[in-house]
């Protein structure tokens, strides 16, 4: 909630340094495996980045975005979910995509996903804990890095969340 207050006041300060995105994604993967030991899942990191590439970004905030997208993929899926985290360069920009085969999101809700406190209505058995701030924070962070974040989803087929930021 502190981050939300800072966003509202436009007081988020980025502390950019060179970061190793594949290492960061692997760390989040390990962390989530510990947090969700009772939910069978597979997380694959597909690293298509040039060897040794480092990106100039705020590591703490970018790691938060990656964690939020990966954790949402776990939370909003049934047991056995397969999550693919793809890391690549497109037009000299870092592209990170998190794809799952989970519940998916209806088009009418996709427009509102990045709105603060918005939560997709779910059936009682699909309802998850949360405040509806993670995607709004992620959008803010990516925008502050000069990038963009988007979603592609279909109900019953899963979702792909992608963000793109400059490498420098």
Label every model-predicted segment.
Residues 9-14, 52-57:
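Conserved micro-motifs of the catalytic ATP-binding
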Residues 146-147:
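Conserved glycine-rich
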């Amino acid at each position: 909630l502190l981050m939300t207050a800072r966003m509202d006041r436009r007081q988020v300060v980025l502390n950019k340094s060179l970061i190793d995105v594949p290492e960061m994604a692997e760390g989040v993967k390990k962390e989530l495996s510990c947090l969700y030991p009772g939910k069978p899942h597979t997380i694959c990191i597909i690293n298509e980045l040039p060897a040794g590439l480092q990106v100039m970004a705020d590591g703490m905030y970018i790691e938060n975005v990656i964690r939020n997208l990966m954790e949402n993929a776990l939370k909003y899926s049934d047991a056995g979910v397969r999550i693919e985290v793809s890391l690549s360069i497109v037009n000299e920009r870092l592209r990170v995509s998190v794809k799952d085969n989970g519940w998916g999101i209806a088009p009418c809700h996709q427009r509102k996903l990045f709105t603060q406190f918005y939560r997709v209505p779910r059936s009682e058995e699909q309802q998850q804990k949360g405040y509806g701030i993670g995607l709004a924070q992620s959008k803010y962070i990516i925008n502050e890095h000069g990038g963009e974040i988007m979603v592609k989803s279909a109900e019953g087929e899963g979702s792909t969340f992608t963000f793109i930021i400059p490498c420098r």
